[in-house]
Structure formats: structure tokens, C-alpha cells
Amino acid sequence: MHIYKSTINNCRFLSLLIFAWALMPQILSAANPERIKIEKGPYLQAVGENEFTVCWRTNMNSVGWIEIAPADGTHFYKKVRPKHFDSTFGRKNIGRFHKVRITGLEPGTAYRYRVMQNSVLLDEDYTRIIYGEGFGSDILSHKPFQVTTLDPAKKSVKFAVGNDFHEKDSLLRKAFAKARDKKYDFVMFNGDMTTRMKNEDYIFDNYLQSASELFASDIPLYMNRGNHENRGSFATRYMDLFPTLTGAPYYTFRQGPVFFLVIDSGEDKPDNDIRNLDIMCHDEFRATQLEWLKGVLDSEEFKKAPVKIVFMHMPPDGTPGSWYGTQELNDKYMPLLNNAGIDLMLCGHYHAFKFVPADTKGYNNKFPIIIHDDAVLLEAEADENTIKIVTYDKNQNPEHRHEFAVSK
């Protein structure tokens, strides 16, 4: 009799355990009533002829994915859309920041996309993963996001540039308020968007979330490091937030007739300067980048492009008043670029507009250079014959205009 009662009690206890196990997701959900949502982003990165990358952050741990559909006029729910997961070599990533690269696309083609995530309530290593609710971008009350891949056959290109905003998010919102209406092919942030790389929130709060809301969910955003992106404890995480087509902070892309060359100018002071905290090694970095640059300039893709434009945050200034970093660029990069048929270089760094015509003493340049002012907008249009530049002041009034004939 005693054995019989003990068996019954054990069975009841086991039943309670099974019941509690089954209720665990509901218990965890009740303990964490916050719903999964897109907290920051999305924003586009590394848009190429056959690919694009979407980045965003959720408010809690989750797995994330992107669903895509051609911009063919059909409803997004017309059919099952392919899912592309934030994953690492076959395993979905669990976290808050998500990054999804989508490849195998057609050049010059518009694609709609939907951002999705499923909350993770419990991750017990090898034992089990308990999921909560899933949700994503609302395609019932809002149109899906849309991106167009790059197209080298396009006859012209229109783009915008901003640099040296240094936490002036309100000025960025003014400068790029009409970015969607102006239908830029892309936007380039050409360095020093913040004074330091403090943490993820600091970057989102000071410019990246505004960029997402104003244009970067649908218009490609390209980034170029300035000297200040090298500073701060989050600096080595730069590539996590801003992936590129090369996997390095220097890269190239082609839109329409223009071959764009993005060069990372590095730090402005010597590596051993006391203010660099004994943490910089940019001499080595610039040497590595220089070898990459030689290969780019020797490529048929570069040589055959009708127009060639360089983005570089620090100008290649070799005048007597220049600093170490700009002198290094002048000494080591300009000899290569001067023989490469460059049509225009766009820089920042000096927080003041300056036009540097070809053959300016101290710059040793065979092509024009525009040093763009801080925290204002530059717009450019180019075809195979002409490059047109307009810069604006902080009240959004046109300030400088330049037109350049493309070298043949």
C-alpha cells in the first residue's frame, strides 16, 4: 500500500513538472510583457549590383530575417516570399542587432523587403530555446521598404554627401529632410559623423536613427571613416554596424558611368602621439590599404569606367601647415591617384569649404578637390561628360556651385 501511494505521488509530481514545462513560454512572457519590435533602423549598407545588406536593432533578444519580393505591383502576401536569416555559417544568430546580406540579385532592379524578428525568451545552450512572439515591419498600413540595386548601365547618377556632423543630429535632419523626395541614388557620409565611437546607442542617437527615418531604409547609405571614427572604445566595432562590399573600411562601387573609390584616410596625428593613447597603428593600415589601391587602379573595371570619383575624409594636404596624416596621404597616395585619371576628389575634415583646383601647390594634385564644409549638404550629379556640384549652407540655401568636364 505504501509503495502504491508513493508511485501515485511520483506520477502526480511528474505531471506537474510536465505541465509547468509546457507553460514555461507563457510564464516567461508574463514576466517580460514587452513586445518585440524594431527599436532602431532599418538602414541599408553595402548595396551593390547583385546584393544589399539590411541592418536593424530590436528591443530584446531575437532571431531576425528579411523577406524580399520584386517590385512588380503584386501584394507582398501574394505568395510565399524567400527568407534570408541573420545567421553565421548555418546557425541563426540570437541578439538585438541584426545584419542580413542578400545576394544573387539583378543589377538596376527594385526589390521590396520586410524586416522580421522572433523574440527569444530563453536560450538554454544545448538544451532548448524558447521563443516568444514574432513580428516585423507592418506591410498592411505601410508600404514595404524598397531598395534598387546598383546599375552600371545607368546614364547618370545623383547623390548626396555629408560629413563632420559631430553629434549635430538636428542639423543632419535639416540637411537630409528632403532626401526621399530628391530621389538620390545614394548618400555618402564622408567621415566624422560623431566625435568618438562610444557605443551603439551613441551612434544611433546622434545620426544613424535619423538617417534611417529620413532615407536610409530605402536609399543606400555608404560610410567612410574619418579620423574620429577611430576614437572611442567602440571603434573596433565599426564594421559590425557598417559592412562593406570588401569587408574592409575601404571599398569601391559603380553606379551609372561613375566608378566610386572610397579611401580611408586614417588618423590625423602620428601613431605615437600621446593623444592617440598608444592604441593606433595607422601607418601599417595605410600601407595595407595602399596595396589594395594599386590593385584597384590596375583593374579593368576601374580603367574602363568613364568617370572616376574619390571619397576621402582627410584631404591630401601637403602644405606647410598640414598635419602628419594629410602629409602621408599626399606623399604616398597622390602619386598613384595622379596617374589614374581621377576626375574629382571629395573630402571633409577642415570644417570649412575649400575648392582646390588641379595643380595647387602643396596638394600636388592633377585633379580638382572639393573640401566640403561641416554639417551641411553637398549634392552631385554626373554623367559621362560632366560632374555638377552644389553645396548648401545650414539654412539649406545653395552656397557653392562647381561644374567639371570629365577627362577623356
Task: Label every model-predicted segment.
Residues 155-230:
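Conserved, compact domain cores that house catalytic/ligand-binding motifs in diverse enzymes
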Residues 28-160, 180-181, 383-408:
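Acidic, histidine-bearing metal-coordination/catalytic regions of metal-dependent phosphoesterases
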Residues 15-26:
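Bacterial N-terminal signal peptides
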Residues 276-278, 282, 300-344:
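Active-site-proximal segments of metal-dependent phosphoesterases and phosphodiesterases across multiple
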Residues 115-146, 202-298, 332-338, 354-385, ...:
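Extended active-site neighborhood of metal-dependent phosphoesterases/phosphodiesterases
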Residues 3-15:
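Bacterial N-terminal signal peptides that target proteins for export
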Residues 155-157, 182-187, 217-221, 255-259, ...:
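Loop/turn elements at helix/coil->beta-strand transitions in domains of secreted/extracellular proteins
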Residues 160-163, 186-192, 220-227, 309-313, ...:
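Active-site neighborhood of phospho(di)ester-bond hydrolases with catalytic His/Asp-centered motifs
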